[in-house]
Swiss-Prot record:
Family: Belongs to the NELF-B family.
Domain of life of the native organism: Eukaryota
Organism: Drosophila melanogaster
One Gene Ontology CC term in the entry: nucleus
Any one of the GO BP annotations: positive regulation of transcription by RNA polymerase II
InterPro entries in the record: COBRA1 (IPR010405)
Role summary: Essential component of the NELF complex, a complex that negatively regulates the elongation of transcription by RNA polymerase II.
The protein, known as: Negative elongation factor B
Taxon lineage: Eukaryota, Metazoa, Ecdysozoa, Arthropoda, Hexapoda
C-alpha cells in the first residue's frame, strides 16, 4: 500500500486516493502537455478556490503582491482549524452518534495522513475515536514520522498490544527519575533542599510521575505494565527509588481521580492512608486501625498483594516516616513511663517496617508471607535503646545545671559509656533494629549531641545488611554533621566517625565517591592535617569512577589547597540512555485487566 511506505519518499502522497489531483497528477500533466503554462493555468482554475465570494478577491491580492500559495495556505489553515474544532465537539457527543460519524470521517481522510498540512485533521479524528481499527494503528507504528505526530490518546491503543514499544517510551522516563533522585542525594552543593523535605503532594507533581500518569490514562493494562517494569527493575537493581515511584504513580492517579485504575488496585486504600500519615507526619488511632485492617484482612489467594504493599513500605519516604514516628513514640513512652509492648501504634509501625524491609526478598522468592516481627526486638532491643535515650536525656539535663550544682547532683553518674550490649547485638540480627538505631543517630545529630552521636555511630557499622551505608541515611547524616563542623577538630569525634564507621564501609562506592566527598567539602578546614591527608588518600577515585567524581575530587583538592570558601557548580554527569527495561518480562497482573 502507498500509505505504508515512508513519508519522506512520497511527500504529499494520498491526495489522489481521495480524488484530489496531487503531485502525481500535476507531474503527468506537465510531462504530457504541449504548453506547460497553459497546463498550469488549467490546473489552477480547476483546483483553486471555487467559492464565488472569494474568487473575485484574487486579482486584488495579486495587486498587493500576495502570493497565491500564501492565500491558499491561509485559507486552508483557517478551514482546518474550524474542522478540528468541529471534530473535537463531535468527540464529546453520545458514543453511538459520535462513533459512526468519526469512523466515516476516518475512512475518507486517513489516505491523506502523510500530507503534513492535513495530518492534524486525521490525528484529531483518531484522538476522538475510542476504538481504532488495527489497520490504522499498524500504519502509524510502521512510519516513524507518523508515530511521532500521533497523540498520546492514540498511542495508548498502540501500546496496549505492543509492550516493547511502550517500554521504549517509558524507559527514558524511569532513567530520568532515578537520576533526579540520585542528584538530590549526592549533590555536594545541596544543603537546603534535602531528600526528605518535599511533601508527598509536591513529589508526585514531578515531571516524570505526571508524564507516566498521562501515558497510562485510564488503561489498566498500561498501568499494570508499568508496575511490572518497576517490580522487575527493583528486583534486578535493588534500587528503592522504584518503590517510591510505584507509590507516587498510584497517588498521582488518585489525585486525577482515575477510578478505572484506583478502584481495582488493591493497594490503593492502604497507600492513600499511608500517604496521609506521611503528609501529616502523624499516625493517629483511626488511621492506625485502617492500616492494620488492610494488613489483617488480606484474603487467602490474594497474598501476592503483599508484594506490592511491601514495595510501598520499602519506599525511603515511608521508611523515614515509620522510623521517625517510632522514635517519637519511644520518647513519649520514656516521659510517661510506658512499655513498648503495650503501645499498639508502635507495634504496627514496627510491623510495617519489617514488611517494607523484606520487600526485595519477598518479590525475589515469590513467597508472599508477611515476615514475623521478632518479639525480642520489642521486649529486649527497644528497652535497651530506651535506656540509651534516657542516658542522653540525663546528660543533657545535667549540662543545663549551674556548675556549682553539677557535682552534687545525682546526674553526675556517667551517662557517656558505650551503648548497651543488647543494642549492638540486635542491630546485627534485625533490620528493624538497625533502622531504629540509625534514626536515633539522626535524632541525636539534629540536637548536636556529640556524645549521643558518638555512642551510636560506634556500633552502626554492625547494622544488618549494611543498612547504615544506604544513600538516604548517609545523605541525612552528612547534612546533620556539617553544622557540627567544630567537632571535627577533636580526635575522639574523628576516630569514631571515620575509623569506626566510615572506613568500615569504604568498599561501598557511594560512601567514598559521594557522601564523604560532600562532607569533606565543608569540614576539611576543621580537620587536623594528618587526618585530612589520610581521608583524601582513601577517597581518591579510581578508573572505575566516572568523570564527574574525578572532577569533583580535583576541585576539592584545589579547594583544600587554596582554602576557598566558594562552592563552584559541577555539571551533572552526562545522561545515559541505556534502557533499564531490557529483558523485562511480560506483565502478569494479580487482578483482572480490562
Amino acid at each position: 500500500m502507498i500509505m505504508s511506505t515512508p513519508a519522506k519518499n512520497n511527500n504529499g502522497t494520498g491526495l489522489e486516493d481521495v480524488n484530489i489531483p496531487g503531485q502525481a497528477y500535476l507531474r503527468e500533466a506537465l510531462t504530457s502537455c504541449t504548453d506547460p503554462l497553459k497546463a498550469i493555468e488549467s490546473f489552477q482554475l480547476e483546483n483553486g478556490v471555487l467559492l464565488p465570494s472569494l474568487r473575485p478577491m484574487l486579482p486584488l491580492l495579486d495587486l498587493h503582491g500576495v502570493r497565491r500559495l500564501d492565500f491558499h495556505t491561509s485559507l486552508m489553515e483557517e478551514l482546518r482549524d474550524k474542522l478540528i474544532a468541529h471534530i473535537n465537539e463531535m468527540g464529546q457527543k453520545e458514543p453511538r452518534e459520535r462513533d459512526k460519524k468519526l469512523k466515516e470521517l476516518l475512512v475518507k481522510s486517513f489516505p491523506v495522513v502523510r500530507v503534513k498540512s492535513l495530518r492534524p485533521v486525521v490525528m484529531a479524528i483518531l484522538r476522538n475515536t475510542q476504538h481504532i481499527d488495527d489497520k490504522y494503528l499498524k500504519i502509524l507504528v510502521r512510519d516513524r514520522e507518523l508515530y511521532a505526530d500521533t497523540d498520546t490518546e492514540v498511542k495508548r491503543q498502540i501500546w496496549r498490544d505492543n509492550q516493547s514499544l511502550f517500554g521504549d517510551e517509558v524507559s527514558p522516563l524511569l532513567s530520568q527519575y532515578i537520576r533526579e533522585k540520585e542528584h538530590i542525594l549526592f549533590d555536594h552543593t545541596n544543603l537546603n533542599n534535602l531528600f526528605f523535605h518535599p511533601t508527598p503532594k509536591v513529589r508526585r507533581q514531578g515531571e516524570v510521575v505526571q508524564k507516566l500518569a498521562n501515558m497510562i490514562g485510564t488503561s489498566v493494562k498500561l498501568y499494570d505494565m508499568v508496575l511490572q517494569f518497576l517490580r522487575t527493575l527493583f528486583l534486578r537493581t535493588r534500587n528503592v527509588h522504584y518503590c517510591t515511584l510505584r507509590a507516587e504513580l498510584l497517588m498521582a492517579l488518585h489525585d486525577l481521580e482515575v477510578q478505572e485504575i484506583i478502584s481495582i488496585d488493591p493497594c490503593h486504600k492502604f497507600t492513600w492512608c499511608l500517604d496521609a500519615c506521611i503528609r501529616e507526619k502523624n499516625v493517629d488511632i483511626k488511621r492506625s486501625r485502617e492500616l492494620q485492617g488492610f494488613l489483617d484482612n488480606i484474603k487467602r489467594g490474594q497474598e501476592q498483594v503483599l508484594g506490592d504493599l511491601s514495595m510501598t513500605l520499602c519506599d525511603p519516604y515511608a521508611i523515614n516516616f515509620l522510623a521517625t514516628s517510632a522514635i517519637k513514640i519511644l520518647h513519649h513512652l520514656i516521659n510517661n513511663e510506658g512499655m513498648p509492648r503495650d503501645n499498639q501504634i508502635l507495634i504496627l509501625l514496627l510491623r510495617m517496617l519489617a514488611l517494607g524491609l523484606s520487600a526485595w526478598v519477598m518479590i525475589d522468592s515469590q513467597d508472599f508471607k508477611e515476615p514475623k516481627l521478632d518479639c525480642q526486638v520489642v521486649t529486649k532491643f527497644l528497652p535497651a535503646l530506651m535506656s540509651l535515650m534516657v542516658d542522653d536525656q540525663c546528660r543533657s539535663l545535667h549540662a543545663k545545671l549551674p556548675p556549682d550544682e553539677r557535682e552534687s547532683a545525682l546526674t553526675t553518674i556517667e551517662h557517656s559509656g558505650p551503648a548497651p550490649d543488647a543494642v549492638e547485638a540486635y542491630i546485627q540480627e534485625s533490620s528493624v533494629a538497625s533502622i531504629l538505631a540509625m534514626y536515633y543517630t539522626l535524632h541525636t545529630a539534629r540536637l548536636k549531641d556529640r556524645v549521643g552521636v558518638l555512642r551510636v555511630l560506634a556500633i552502626l557499622s554492625a547494622c544488618k545488611d549494611d543498612r547504615a551505608y544506604e544513600d538516604p541515611f548517609l545523605h541525612s547524616l552528612i547534612a546533620l554533621l556539617i553544622p557540627m563542623s567544630e567537632e571535627f577538630a577533636t580526635e575522639d569525634f574523628c576516630t569514631t566517625l571515620f575509623d569506626e564507621f566510615i572506613f568500615a564501609g569504604l568498599t561501598r562506592e557511594n560512601v567514598t565517591s559521594r557522601h564523604m566527598l560532600k562532607l569533606l567539602w565543608y569540614v576539611h578546614n576543621k580537620l587536623p592535617a594528618g587526618r585530612l591527608a589520610t581521608l583524601m588518600k582513601a577517597m581518591q577515585p579510581t578508573t572505575a569512577h566516572n568523570e564527574h567524581i574525578h572532577k569533583l575530587y580535583e576541585i576539592l583538592q584545589e579547594r583544600i589547597g587554596t582554602g576557598a570558601a566558594e562552592t563552584p557548580v559541577i555539571e551533572a554527569p552526562p545522561m545515559e540512555f541505556d534502557s533499564p527495561l531490557k529483558s523485562v518480562p511480560t506483565p502478569g497482573p494479580h487482578y483482572n485487566v480490562q
